[in-house]
Amino acid sequence: MKDYYAILGVSREASQEEIKKAYRRLALKYHPDRNPGDKEAEERFKEINEAYAVLSDPKKRAAYDRGHLEAPEYRPEDLFDLFFQEVFGVRGHRRPPRGEDLEAEVEVELQDLLHGAEKEVRYTRLVPCEACGGEGGRRTPCPTCRGQGVVESYRQSFFGTVVTRTACPHCKGRGYLLAETCPACRGRGRVPREERVRVQVPPGMDEGHLLRVPGYGNLGPGGPGDLYLRIRVRPHPHLERQGPDLVYRLRLGLAQAALGARVVVPGLEGPIPLDIPPGTGHGEVFALEGGGLPLPGGRGRGTLRVVVELAVPKKLSPKAQKLLRAYAEEVGEEVAPEGFWERLKGFFRK
């Protein structure tokens, strides 16, 4: 993904005010009207607007910072609208607005991220009211803006005469007033409807990644918005995820660690045999290359790390105690005398 901070020439810790200031300066510098016929300047102008569209939105910026935002797509008219709104405080030209973007969650299993998986998501979006055809009721043209939805004023700038179009304060930019309100949608023109969409979750997706589904947001006069699906990975009963790597905590008994053992560890594609060498200590790690999740760009897979945790028994049979005391004597380790803890407990009971 592009480095939007570098495009605007700001640091990753930049405030919203600093981002806005940098955007205005660069947008004016590379505006096509200032650079007629310059294709490079035109591309820079698009990049600058694209970067600002993401970094000026706190939710999109947070997702971008975590690397969880898919590359957005913007129509050229959206970028020019953004320029006029941010630089001059007005929209460049009037057209029916798109519906709002929506966000929902899609839950996946860890195994789903190995090869990718198709998932069905249920969510609710706004669609035109069938009772009134999306009009909200019986409409009459607004007398203030004569049905245009905007009022115009003119000002001079270094671009020449700039026509400032602002939303009509009487009809709030709609261009009409409601003579009668539709009872089904209460004049809103849209009603909620439960939808289903099937999406393909790519391999290796991170927790919290935003998966963009174009055209599945709320429906508006200018077309639908987009649906963003936030990836939620259900916890695995045995494996922990650390980026593309997986971690399995293997509990070994004292005898297994000292003498070595052949064990089986769980993997995403089935059990994996593992030979534990004699003398393995607590905290040792065995790296099984290729046992993790897919790496970005098809560069193979991460590592399954098996972390050894020694399981010290809390209770021993008399025979096991005798064998351990014999071992301690053999290697010269000092241990508590036999019956010491029982005598100590009895002392405190008195």
From Swiss-Prot:
CXXCXGXG motif repeats lie at residues 129-136, 142-149, 168-175, 182-189. Gene3D superfamilies: DnaJ domain, Heat shock protein DnaJ, cysteine-rich domain, Urease metallochaperone UreE, N-terminal domain. GO terms for biological process: chaperone cofactor-dependent protein refolding; DNA replication; protein refolding; response to heat. The keyword Cytoplasm applies. Residues 3-68 form the J domain. One of its GO terms (molecular function) is unfolded protein binding. The J domain is necessary and sufficient to stimulate DnaK ATPase activity. Zinc center 1 plays an important role in the autonomous, DnaK-independent chaperone activity of DnaJ. Zinc center 2 is essential for interaction with DnaK and for DnaJ activity. Participates actively in the response to hyperosmotic and heat shock by preventing the aggregation of stress-denatured proteins and by disaggregating proteins, also in an autonomous, DnaK-independent fashion. Unfolded proteins bind initially to DnaJ; upon interaction with the DnaJ-bound protein, DnaK hydrolyzes its bound ATP, resulting in the formation of a stable complex. GrpE releases ADP from DnaK; ATP binding to DnaK triggers the release of the substrate protein, thus completing the reaction cycle. This is Chaperone protein DnaJ.
